[in-house]
Amino acid sequence: MKKLIFCLILAMLSQTFGSFGQEKTIWKIGENDNSPDKMALAPDQYRQFLASDFGYEDNYFLVGHSKAEKDWPYVLPGPANDWGGTATLSGIRANFLNINFELKQKPSSGNWKFTLDILQTDPVNAPLLQVIMNGKAWKFKLNKGNGSKNPEGDFSNAKEQLISIDVPNDLIRAGNNEIVITVPEGGWLAFDQVKLEGPSETRLDLPKEILLKNITAANYETLLNGKNFQPLLIDLQHIKGSPSIQVKLDGSVILSQKIEQGRYVLEAPMPEVSAEKSSQYEIYLNHQLLRKGEVKRAPKAIKTPADYVNTMLGVAHSRWMIAPGPWMPFGMVKLSPDNQNTGWQAGYDPAFESIGTFSHIHEWTMTGLGTFQRQAR
């Protein structure tokens, strides 16, 4: 009997330790060595953060392509830090660090953990850390640091803080995944390491020429050559080269396009349907199958050119803001010159502020006309 109990305990222990052993580091940025030296701008070039093009919403660190020493800053400023873009004339600036990683294979079950090893924080203004993974957000109020006012010098005696997030398995997906790290309140934080752990069967994919971010059916129809189409929206990011994309719907080619630079949201025209219907799509990169899946189609309302207008687009980093007013029709929208270099920003950041009723007319002046931003149809 004692022998049986001993064997049962041994079996349970082996299963327990075996389950721990099934997790592995999927990817990491930096080393857990209490030093930021292997990251960009380290150890004291924090004032070059904006000039080095860090913090902008459309920049990203792509696992498998980007290099920490060049593409990941050792420090992330908060709105309390003037060197991060916040100033009296320019308003409050939010900075973002985006991580994209693509999974070739995602296990149906398993444990995932995202870890931020924070080496040091602002000793005056404790940062509020926000992490957004595939749309789900977590917030953490960090403690004030024990070092100098600015992130420079020796970090050997730093007050390290470890943030671990148990990520739900259903939040991770095959294909592209995105993590956004920002500090909406408080001051700076310095990184020691950022990493993701997951099941040992997980396989990273390394996109070569494009990053396929998302594929979905549009909730509208467009008019093309007198016919209605419901677009298949293909959100992708150019990486390198001049690759060609081909989209097939139920075996028929509906779009062919060369990808050259930047981010695209392609509208592949799916013929309109009179009732809900499921179809199969295939996406080819340079004539090689990249992704396939099912899309649900349905009748939708027509989208006009005015519906594409976003009156807030770009305002967070524009020198003179949006300029509607009595000197031009209220239904029109005009973006005034973005005449500052990349290390300076002005305008209104929608992460903090909202534009109510005012109008900028010709210059850096607000008037009380009570003009709302809108576009005509």
Briefly describe each language-model feature range.
Residues 7-15:
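Bacterial N-terminal signal peptides
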Residues 178-182, 247, 276-287:
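Short, aromatic- and glycine-rich surface loops/edge beta-strands on solvent-exposed regions
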Residues 1-4:
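Positively charged n-region of N-terminal signal peptides that target proteins for export
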Residues 194-226:
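Short, compositionally biased P/S/T/A/G/V-rich stretches that sit at domain boundaries
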Residues 22-109, 117-203, 259-271:
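Beta-strand-rich ligand-recognition modules
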Residues 91-101, 107-115, 217-235:
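Contiguous beta-strand segments within globular domains
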Residues 227-231, 238-243, 261-263, 270-284, ...:
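Accessory carbohydrate-recognition regions in carbohydrate-active enzymes
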